Amino acid sequence: DITEALLQVVYKLQKTDTETDSTELQKIAVHEAAHAVVGEVLHPGSIGIVTVRGNQGVIGGMANGCATYAQNEEEFLDEVTKTLAGRAGVSLIYGVMDIQASADIEQADKLMDIWQCHFAGGGFVGIESGDNRMSEQRLSYNEAIKSAKLEELYRRAYKILHNNKYFLLAVQHGLLEHETLLNSDLAKIRESCI
């Protein structure tokens, strides 16, 4: 099967030998589904693959359908929103904080550092000329801006998922049934939810 070969060779995703608790697997599936749903809502056709399979001890993942780079601030913030969507999805469906989302939070934090330098002016103001470092006051100010923007984008992801809950649940169901969904599967699911 070509999909199986793609998963193993390109993405290095193996069928897991260990049994994952069914409740935990449902949360993993909604987490991954949330990334895919937000990506598809913001940029239809942009998600290439979403899976609950694992790689190096990490279960679940998602990849864009093609190499896409943010061309502007809006696209960049869409990427951060998609990154935060897994956590928002678990909160929406299960009413609990997704404590497994630390890698996503770290990624969102890194993306926000880039956003501040390139789009928010954080890289151009507050520099102390003597040692070419930011002042403590400026660092604190930048962290406050970043934190507020992350909260805003998390709420944006939550709202997108709330407005597309049937799509989210259908993708979760598809992941629980098939482990992996491709771009074409997501398109069919989305069409059935409209």
Question: Model regions: which residues?
Answer:
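Non-transmembrane, extramembrane segments of multi-pass ion/lipid transporters
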Residues: 8-14
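Soluble catalytic regions of large protease machineries
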Residues: 16-30, 36-194
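Conserved AAA+ ATPase small/helical "lid" subdomain
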Residues: 1-7
